[in-house]
Amino acid sequence: MQRIPRAVAAAAAAVCALAGVSLRSQDFKKQVIYQIVTDRFYDGDTTNDNPAESPGLFDSTHTQWQAYWGGDLAGIQDQLSYIKGMGATAIWVSPVVNNENLNCTSSGISAPYHGYWARDFMNIEEHFGDNSNSFSAFDSLVAALHSNNMKMIVDEANNHSNPDNCGEMGSLYNNGTFMAAANNDPNGYFHHNPDISNYNDRYQLQYYTLEDLTDLNQENATIDAYLKSAASQLQSHHVDAFRLDAVKDVTWGWEYSFANSVYNNAPSFLYGEWDQSNTGDPLYPDSYKFANDSGISLLDFPLNTAIRDVFASNNNFSEIDSTINTENSNFTYPNDLVTFFDSQDESRLLTLNDDQNRLQEAMAFLLTGRGIPIIFYGDEQYLFNNTNGGNDPYNRVWMSSFNTGTTAYKIIAKLAGLRAANDAVGYGTWKQRWLNNDVYIYERQFFNDVVLVAINKNDTTGYSITGLYTALPPGTYTDYLGGLQNGNSLTVTSGSGGNNPANNYTIAPASVSVWQYQVNAATPEVGSIGPHVGQPGMTVTIAGDGFGSSQGSVLFGSSAAAIQSWSNTSVTFTVPNVSNGSYNVQLKNSGGTAANTIAFTVLAAKLIPVTFTVNNANPTNPGDYIFVTGNTVELGNWGTTFQTAIGPMLDPNYPNWFLNVSLPAGATVQFKFIDIQANGNVVWENGSNHQYTVPTSGTGYDTVNWQY
């Protein structure tokens, strides 16, 4: 489509700012995200291909894979009709901030085309925008997205600046003013530690260097303010959500305060990259503790592994089923997990298995499955490059085709429409209905809305499906995909208890069938709350169906929240002035009919990152860890388990332990340190509770001795 003229774009942006929650809603469960590596998508402005600020990093032949190739924000806007036609409702773009200006190799080109080598978080990369590093092209794209009722997700990399061993040597700027570099850091803006060698070591992950990238010290008050200001600036330019790079490698406690800062600024949605192979990963319990408590959802790496194993490597479907069941039992908000099977960091599925049926089946699974789906750019065009096993950078191919007629494109469009229309997909529960090595039949249900999906990944063999039960009401259902992936109709007869028998049938090879039923809700049904953690005064949105057009109430215990807006499917309110703790929030319609409750954590105040150190702590054995616990929800409300106490703390200088924790601004908190032993026993320190008054801004530090 034509790009919106800049004057019109500015006006549209102003309208978006006034439009409120409809465009800025925290509820992403019904979205379909299209991930774009900006430099590899489309060249909409050739004047920024070889800018004066960073010359010689562009390759017009698209043969030097570590060079810029010309894709930019204007190019994304040029192709917006293509993206929207596919059913995507949000785009996730690679980091847009100003990146390293110098070549990082002595032979060929090594440039930050990917966006992850920031030098200045406060302005836009000239290769993506313009020679003045202005927000003009960015604002135009965001305005165009919002005028199409689509959302903008920006990737933010809070872990690091740029490489510490080449080019600008990690140099960091604040809107053009030099702050520090890896070899010039008098104020301690960076950590100066070796590269991470043990990715299961909590201290190394958070304080060592990730692949030579100069590691930012978020506990430094200047860096804390800088990173939060960078996010705030993007929000002032109407960004709807953030994908947070490498959250596993950033100081975990600080990230709670970062999320809180973002939510204090404006409605948003945050999801982070916590790389792990499966639910057996040693730090898997840390991952769901982080997601449940921080307000930051996660990219679903365990499910990514399972999808790739099943659809590319022909593993048993039970791997997917087991992964989903495990995660659903661990994550408080599993429908907020962000799901994917391809990305900028791994070989594409078609490199692993060049079978378009398998790709299309995986897409259908992703789009009907639990979580918020991401389509990696070009998958709908079957793009891949097998050089070096298709690994980085060969997975970041040039987007050479925009064909709207591929089967994959059509499947995405159909199922994106289903996700928007049927609440079972975005909000529903998950139930396996039939399973063997090659066939997976699963059901999504949200009250009376039902979606049943049957996938056979075997390209040559059909299977007789007997004993299938479903929550679909009696009737005959046609394939929602209309046969795009060899689907068929299904007849359901009457049963009992939400288990209606389906007629026996043979599932075709290489097939996906989708059957669905939906009704208008007669009573209020809550499917989402976002964010799910915040202090009194924060804006929160509940989404679902059947709320009615007349205003009802939202209750935290007996305390009513102030309603900002009310519609049949979405209610925005202000968290009331209640005590900190966990609440089951209750929505009632104007007639007093109550919906199902949904969990929310009320904080005591906005969050400030504080580093606690306890010297000479209780001696520990392998598997024992020191935690902190205290008298506020931010300190675990005196919890004494791995999931409820705060930690584990870190011990690079054993027997001294430390931990960064986000605490309520201005509050005087009481706390103690405990030793949670490998067998579950808890050893408390003696003496009175420690006491600390949290700063009202910046960062804090407190050091005490273990009380024997």
Residue ranges: model-predicted function:
Residues 520-551, 592-605:
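Beta-strand/beta-sandwich contexts
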Residues 25-32, 39-237, 253-276, 280-283, ...:
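Substrate-binding/active-site clefts of carbohydrate-active enzymes
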Residues 56, 618-668, 676-695:
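Aromatic-rich carbohydrate-binding modules that target alpha-glucans
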Residues 141-150, 160, 228-333, 337-340, ...:
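Active-site-proximal helices and loops of the catalytic beta/alpha 8
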Residues 36, 540-544, 554, 571-573, ...:
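A structural motif
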Residues 587-589, 675:
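Conserved structural position at the C-terminal beta-strand
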Residues 470-475, 545-551, 620-624, 631-632, ...:
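Short proline/glycine-enriched turn/loop motifs at strand-loop junctions of beta-rich domains
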Residues 491-507, 676-708:
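Structured interaction patches on ligand/partner-binding surfaces of diverse proteins
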